[in-house]
From Swiss-Prot:
CDD domains reported in the protein's UniProt record: T3SC_IA_SycT-like (cd17032)
Keywords assigned by UniProt, alphabetized: Chaperone, Plasmid
Pfam family, one: CesT
Lineage, opening ranks: Bacteria, Pseudomonadati, Pseudomonadota, Gammaproteobacteria, Enterobacterales
InterPro entries: Tir_chaperone
Organism, scientific name: Yersinia pestis
Binding partners and assembly: Binds to YopT.
This protein's name: Chaperone protein SycT
Length: 132
């Protein structure tokens, strides 16, 4: 028997112990603190496609990477003039463990994109640097 979107979300939030809100359109929202806060929205389009969304912030550069390292891809785009990260995959065959892994990769991707560009690599005296 195929799991419905509502059942999948109930199982996910129960397993992760996360507080969440759900609106009248079955959009699930949760916020968590990681050097600030990140809000993730989870929705289901036509009961076929599970979608993840998160607003990234106004100071991020445009990213043209349409295909990511992992499937499902995480796409950086714009919605109402604001940079967002979104991803989607089919509800068919999506189980709780796959949903959790996908959500964790999505959150990791958000954190990496929100990290200030000048702090991504800072060589120090112990960093091996090749001089030619």
């Amino acid at each position: 028997m195929q799991t419905t979107f509502t059942e999948l979300m109930q199982q996910l939030f129960l397993k992760l112990g996360l507080n969440h809100q759900v609106n009248e359109n079955d959009v699930y929202t949760f916020t968590f603190e990681v050097d600030g806060h990140i809000q993730v929205l989870i929705a289901c389009y036509h009961q076929q496609w599970v979608q993840l969304f998160s607003e990234l912030g106004a100071d991020l550069p445009t990213n043209d990477n349409l295909f990511g390292e992992h499937w499902p891809a995480h796409v950086q785009g714009r919605l109402d003039g604001k940079p967002i990260l979104w991803s989607q995959q089919s509800l068919v065959g999506l189980d709780i463990d796959e949903m959790q892994a996908w959500l964790e990769r999505f959150i990791d991707d958000i954190e990496q994109r929100k990290e200030p560009q000048n702090t991504k690599f800072q060589p120090n005296s112990t960093s091996p640097i090749l001089f030619i």
